[in-house]
């Protein structure tokens, strides 16, 4: 039972924020590609897939960081550095989760299956990027955005320009919120030699986050224009602007706890845009 609890925590199943951040853009894509009526079967497959792949990503991340997490205050009690799960057990779990994800995606068409291999490769690559580049957040952004083209191929949509805009918007948004996350760990990362956009941006971190968020808003606005939403659906975009502003208030002093709180707050960004799309298609 203790092993099961430890593996549950290794998957971060007790902390669903990552699943939310992976699921919301996928839901956006399913809504747009399916004109508000994506088949329930496909929606269920994608939602289960986001949970499984996010879990797999957490497992491989902790495997990759097993020699570092013990030196970071926020991560030293994770199952591997705490000795509750071995590195071998973690890899077995990772492979098992990939097998489950593969079983899910095999229910979809060939194009989506092919994209899933690229998605899995990027997800496995991300944790190791922190050792050789200051831009691991971009790799994470790509990994967290693969559900978008997969949704469009699964629903056989030809709206590829919109899919591209959504893909890019999500990458920019991911880099913004993961920079907030990295700001919480910046001092520890500097000590142990890990790299991030928070370290790269330095004293311009808040400015960089703001520019990324504005670019995200611009791309989301372009998408709303292309799908010709009603005027009041634009209120969702206005609400997102205010939510971004609140995040800047949280990170204004760069306090690690507040930066992490700002990161968690991005769940509402994804939810609000999904609500805006639901209003457009359903009402």
UniProtKB/Swiss-Prot annotation:
Its cofactor is Mg(2+). One of its GO terms (cellular component) is plasma membrane. Its main location: membrane. Pfam families: UbiA. The keyword Iron does not apply. InterPro entries: HB_polyprenyltransferase-like, Prenyltransferase, UbiA_prenyltransferase, UbiA_prenylTrfase_CS, UbiA_sf. It is found in: Cell inner membrane. The chain crosses the membrane at residues 16-36, 40-60, 85-105, 108-128, 135-155, 160-180, 204-224, 226-246, 263-283. It catalyses: all-trans-octaprenyl diphosphate + 4-hydroxybenzoate = 4-hydroxy-3-(all-trans-octaprenyl)benzoate + diphosphate. Its EC number is 2.5.1.39. It is a multi-pass membrane protein. Disulfide bonds: none annotated. Pathway: Cofactor biosynthesis; ubiquinone biosynthesis. Keywords: Cell inner membrane, Cell membrane, Magnesium, Membrane, Transferase, Transmembrane, Transmembrane helix, Ubiquinone biosynthesis. The keyword Transmembrane applies. GO terms for biological process: ubiquinone biosynthetic process. GO terms for molecular function: 4-hydroxybenzoate polyprenyltransferase activity. It comes from the Bacteria. Catalyzes the prenylation of para-hydroxybenzoate (PHB) with an all-trans polyprenyl group. Mediates the second step in the final reaction sequence of ubiquinone-8 (UQ-8) biosynthesis, which is the condensation of the polyisoprenoid side chain with PHB, generating the first membrane-bound Q intermediate 3-octaprenyl-4-hydroxybenzoate. HAMAP family: UbiA. Belongs to the UbiA prenyltransferase family. This is 4-hydroxybenzoate octaprenyltransferase. The gene is ubiA.
């Amino acid at each position: 039972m203790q092993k099961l609890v430890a593996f549950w925590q290794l998957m971060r199943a007790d902390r669903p924020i990552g699943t939310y951040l992976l699921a919301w853009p996928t839901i956006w894509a399913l809504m747009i590609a399916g004109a508000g009526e994506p088949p329930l079967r496909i929606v269920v497959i994608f939602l289960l897939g986001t949970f499984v792949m996010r879990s797999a990503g957490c497992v491989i991340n902790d495997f990759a960081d097993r020699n570092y997490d013990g030196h970071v205050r926020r991560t030293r009690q994770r199952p591997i550095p705490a000795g509750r799960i071995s590195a071998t057990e973690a890899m077995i779990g990772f492979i098992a989760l990939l097998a489950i994800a593969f079983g899910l995606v095999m229910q979809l068409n060939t194009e989506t299956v092919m994209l899933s291999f690229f998605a899995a490769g990027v997800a496995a690559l991300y944790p190791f990027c922190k050792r050789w580049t200051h831009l691991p957040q971009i790799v994470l952004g790509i990994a967290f955005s693969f559900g978008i083209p997969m949704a469009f191929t699964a629903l056989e949509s030809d709206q590829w320009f919109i899919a591209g805009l959504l893909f890019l918007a999500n990458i920019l948004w991911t880099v913004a919120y993961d920079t907030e996350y990295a700001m919480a760990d910046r001092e520890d990362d500097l000590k142990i030699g890990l790299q991030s956009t928070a370290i790269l941006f330095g004293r311009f971190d808040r400015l960089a986050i703001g520019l990324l968020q504005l670019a995200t808003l611009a791309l989301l606005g372009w998408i709303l224009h292309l799908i010709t939403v009603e005027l009041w659906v634009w209120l969702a975009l206005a609400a997102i602007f205010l939510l971004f502003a609140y995040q800047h208030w949280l990170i204004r002093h760069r306090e690690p706890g507040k930066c992490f709180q700002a990161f968690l707050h991005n769940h509402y960004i994804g939810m609000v845009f999904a609500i805006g799309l639901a209003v457009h298609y359903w009402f």
